[in-house]
C-alpha cells in the first residue's frame, strides 16, 4: 500500500490541452513507467471491466433509489432509452438497463467524474474544471530528474498545474541532503585543516587529511556493502566524523610537540588509542540495537571509519610524519593558554562550580519532568518544502482525497461489515468522511438485493407493460430481464482480480480491510471514547493513527536508548577499570555522567527538543568523553601535552558537530548540537575530576 502511494504523482491541469505535457516531459527525463490521462491505461480494457463490474460497482446511492421505488427507476430508464442525448457507457445490447452509467468507478473513488468523450477524469472546484493525470514512477528513478520535470512544468504553466505526491518530498529531501552533505563535508575539512595548521604551523600536518579520506571512504563503502544502500542522512552525519577521525592522530602528536617526531613514539600510546577506539566503538555499537536503519547505518559507518583511522594512525602516519618537527602558532597558543587559565580558575573554585552545575541540573530536570511527555513528534524531524506542501493541500481540497493519517483495520473483512461499521461511526459523529472499498463496491448481500429486485420486476406485469407501451417487444423485454438476472454476484477477491479494480487492492490484504477516515476528534479523544471502542469491537476493527504510531515508535526507541546509555556507561566503566584503578574509573564515569546531565539540562532549560537523535547524540558524546578521560589519565604524557591533545581534538570534533547544526533537518540539528555541547562541557568538567588532587589547574609555560 505504501509503495503504491509513494510512487504515484498526481497532476491537476485547469486546461485540458495541457494534459499531454507530462508525457512529453517524460520523454526527456524518463522517470515514469506509466502515465494515465483517462480512467485506465487501455480504454477498451476499461470498458470491458466496467461491463464486468456494472453491478458490483454500482453507486450505492443509486441502489438505494432502486430499492425505494423500483417502478420509478424503470420509468426513468424508459425515458433514458428514448432520449438520444444521454451518453451510454456501454451499448444497449450489453447493458440494457444502463447500470454502467451509474458506476462508482466513473468517479474514481473521489470527486472525479469520467468524461467518456475525451477519456479523461475531471472535477469542478471553485467554478474551475481540473483534469487529472496520474503517473507512476519507476522503482529506480532519478529524484533529481523528478524535480527538473516539476520545475519545467511550473515554469511553463505556473499555477495552472497542481502537482502532488509523496515522492516529491522524498526527492526534495534527497536533493537537500546531497547539498548539505557536500557543503558540510567541505566546510568540516577546511575548518579542521585550518585548526591543524594553526596548531602545528607546518603544511605537512595536512597529511592528517589522508587519514580522513582513507577512513571515510572505507566507512561509506562498508555501509553500502553491508546494507546494500545508504541513507542520505547517514552521509550528512558522517561529515561529523572528520573531527573524531583525527583524534587518534592528535593524541599521538600531542606527545611530540616541540621535538623531532620518531615513528617509534607511537608505541607509547598504542594501548590508550586501542582503549579509546573500543570505548567510542561501543558508543556507536549501541546504535545497532536501535530499530532505525538510519542509526544502524551511522553505527556501521562510524565504527569502520574509526577502526580504519586507528590502523592508519598506528601503521602508516608515524612513518609519513617521521622526522617532522611541529611547534604551535602564537594565535593557537593564546587561545590554548586562555583555556588553561579558565581551567585554573574553575579548579580554584571547584566546589562552587560543582554547586552551580548541580543547581542547573536540578533546574533542568524539574523543567524536563514538568513539561516533557517523553513522546516524540515526527513533524519535528524534517523540513518540508512549502511549495510542495501548498500544492498538496490544494490537491487534497480539489480531489477530496487528503490521505488522512487515521485508519481502521477490519479483521475477516467483508464490504458489508465495513459499510455497517461506517454507518454507525457516522451516525455517532465519530468520523466525518472516509475512504474504503464500500465507497466503490457493493457487498455480496447488496448485489443479491439488486438481483432480487430484477427478479420480482420481471414478474410484475405493470412494469413489463410500461416497456411494451413504448413499442418494445414483450419477448425482448423478458430476455433483457433474464440477462440482468444472469450477472454473477462477486465477492471482494473476485472484484479485485479485475484489472480496473486492482488499484483498490491496497485497501484489502490478507483478509484484512483498511478504511481511511477524517474526524474532528483527536487521537486521544477517540481512544477514550467508549462508543467508538464498542463499535470497533462489534465489527472486529482496530484503530490506528499513522503519525501517533510513528511517534510512539520513536518514543519507544528513545526509552530504549536511555537503557542503552546506562549500559554504555557501565561498559565504559568496566573498560576503564581494567586499564586504571577502580577509584579513577568511578571518578571519570561520574564526571562523564555529570557532564551529560549538565548538557541535557541546558537543552531542557532552553526548551530544545530532546528527541531520539539528541538522545543518541548524548550516547555518542558519552563515549567520546570517556576517550578524553583516558587521555587525561595517561601518565606517559605530561599534563600540558594531555591538555593540548584533548583541546585540539575536542576543537576539531566540536567544529564538525557544530556544522551539523546548520542543517535544515531538525533531527540532524539536535544530533549535532547535543554532541558539540557535551564535548564543550567535557573540556571543563573532566579536568575537575581527572586532576582532583591538584589545588589548581596547570599553569601555562611562559
Where do the model's predicted regions map?
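Extracytoplasmic
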Residues: 41-197, 202, 438-573
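Juxtamembrane segments of multi-pass membrane proteins
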Residues: 351-352, 357-469
Amino acid at each position: 500500500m505504501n509503495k503504491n502511494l509513494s510512487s504515484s504523482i498526481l497532476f491537476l491541469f485547469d486546461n485540458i490541452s495541457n494534459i499531454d505535457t507530462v508525457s512529453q516531459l517524460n520523454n526527456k527525463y524518463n522517470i515514469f513507467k506509466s502515465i494515465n490521462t483517462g480512467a485506465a491505461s487501455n480504454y477498451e480494457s476499461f470498458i470491458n471491466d466496467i461491463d464486468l463490474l456494472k453491478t458490483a460497482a454500482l453507486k450505492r446511492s443509486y441502489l438505494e433509489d432502486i430499492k425505494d421505488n423500483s417502478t420509478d427507476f424503470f420509468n426513468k430508464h424508459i425515458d433514458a432509452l428514448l432520449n438520444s442525448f444521454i451518453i451510454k457507457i456501454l451499448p444497449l445490447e450489453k447493458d440494457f438497463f444502463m447500470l454502467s452509467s451509474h458506476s462508482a468507478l466513473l468517479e474514481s473513488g473521489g470527486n472525479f467524474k469520467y468524461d467518456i468523450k475525451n477519456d479523461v477524469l475531471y472535477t469542478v472546484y471553485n467554478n474551475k474544471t481540473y483534469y487529472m493525470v496520474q503517473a507512476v514512477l519507476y522503482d529506480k528513478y532519478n529524484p533529481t530528474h523528478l524535480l527538473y520535470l516539476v520545475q519545467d512544468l511550473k515554469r511553463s504553466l505556473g499555477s495552472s498545474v497542481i502537482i502532488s505526491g509523496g515522492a516529491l518530498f522524498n526527492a526534495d529531501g534527497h536533493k537537500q541532503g546531497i547539498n548539505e552533505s557536500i557543503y558540510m563535508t567541505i566546510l568540516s575539512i577546511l575548518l579542521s585543516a585550518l585548526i591543524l595548521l594553526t596548531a602545528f604551523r607546518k603544511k605537512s600536518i595536512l597529511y592528517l587529511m589522508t587519514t580522513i579520506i582513507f577512513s571515510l571512504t572505507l566507512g561509506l563503502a562498508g555501509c553500502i556493502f553491508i546494507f546494500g544502500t545508504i541513507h542520505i542522512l547517514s552521509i550528512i552525519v558522517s561529515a561529523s566524523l572528520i573531527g573524531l577521525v583525527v583524534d587518534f592522530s592528535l593524541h599521538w602528536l600531542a606527545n611530540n610537540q616541540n621535538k623531532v617526531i620518531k615513528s617509534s613514539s607511537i608505541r607509547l600510546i598504542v594501548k590508550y588509542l586501542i582503549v579509546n577506539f573500543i570505548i567510542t566503538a561501543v558508543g556507536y555499537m549501541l546504535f545497532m540495537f536501535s530499530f532505525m536503519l538510519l542509526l544502524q547505518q551511522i553505527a556501521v559507518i562510524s565504527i569502520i571509519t574509526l577502526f580504519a583511522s586507528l590502523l592508519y594512525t598506528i601503521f602508516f602516519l608515524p612513518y609519513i610524519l617521521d622526522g617532522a618537527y611541529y611547534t604551535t602558532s602564537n594565535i593557537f597558543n593564546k587561545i590554548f593558554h586562555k583555556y588553561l587559565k579558565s581551567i585554573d580558575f574553575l579548579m580554584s573554585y571547584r566546589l562552587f562550580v560543582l554547586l552551580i552545575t548541580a543547581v542547573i541540573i536540578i533546574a533542568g530536570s524539574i523543567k524536563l519532568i514538568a513539561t516533557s511527555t517523553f513522546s516524540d513528534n515526527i513533524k519535528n524531524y524534517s523540513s518540508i518544502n512549502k511549495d510542495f506542501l501548498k500544492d498538496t493541500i490544494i490537491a487534497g481540497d480539489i480531489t477530496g482525497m487528503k490521505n488522512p493519517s487515521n485508519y481502521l483495520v477490519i479483521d475477516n473483512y467483508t464490504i458489508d461489515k465495513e459499510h455497517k461499521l461506517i454507518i454507525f461511526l457516522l451516525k455517532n459523529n465519530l468520523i466525518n468522511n472516509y475512504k474504503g472499498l464500500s465507497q466503490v463496491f457493493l457487498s455480496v448481500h447488496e448485489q443479491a438485493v439488486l438481483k432480487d429486485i430484477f427478479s420480482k420486476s420481471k414478474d410484475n406485469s405493470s412494469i413489463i407493460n410500461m416497456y411494451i407501451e413504448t413499442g418494445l417487444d414483450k419477448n425482448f423485454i423478458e430476455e433483457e430481464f433474464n440477462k440482468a438476472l444472469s450477472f454473477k454476484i462477486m465477492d471482494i477477491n473476485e472484484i479485485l482480480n479485475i484489472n480496473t479494480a486492482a488499484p483498490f487492492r491496497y485497501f484489502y490484504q490478507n483478509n484484512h480491510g483498511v478504511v481511511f477516515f477524517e474526524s474532528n476528534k483527536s487521537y486521544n479523544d477517540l481512544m477514550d471514547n467508549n462508543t467508538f471502542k464498542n463499535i470497533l469491537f462489534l465489527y472486529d476493527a482496530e484503530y490506528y493513527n499513522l503519525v501517533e504510531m510513528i511517534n510512539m515508535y520513536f518514543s519507544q526507541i528513545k526509552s530504549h536508548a536511555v537503557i542503552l546509555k546506562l549500559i554504555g556507561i557501565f561498559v565504559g566503566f568496566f573498560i576503564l577499570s581494567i586499564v586504571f584503578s577502580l577509584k579513577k574509573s568511578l571518578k571519570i564515569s561520574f564526571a562523564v555522567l555529570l557532564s551529560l546531565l549538565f548538557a541535557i539540562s541546558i537543552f531542557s532549560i532552553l526548551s530544545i527538543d530532546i528527541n531520539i537523535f539528541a538522545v543518541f547524540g548524548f550516547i555518542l558524546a558519552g563515549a567520546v568523553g570517556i576517550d578524553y578521560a583516558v587521555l587525561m589519565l595517561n601518565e606517559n604524557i605530561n599534563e600540558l601535552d594531555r591538555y593540548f591533545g584533548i583541546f585540539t581534538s575536542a576543537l576539531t570534533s566540536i567544529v564538525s558537530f557544530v556544522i551539523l547544526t546548520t542543517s535544515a533537518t531538525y533531527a540532524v540539528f539536535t544530533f549535532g548540537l547535543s554532541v558539540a555541547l557535551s564535548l564543550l562541557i567535557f573540556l571543563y568538567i573532566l579536568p575537575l575530576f581527572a586532576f582532583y588532587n591538584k589545588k589548581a589547574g596547570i599553569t601555562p609555560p611562559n
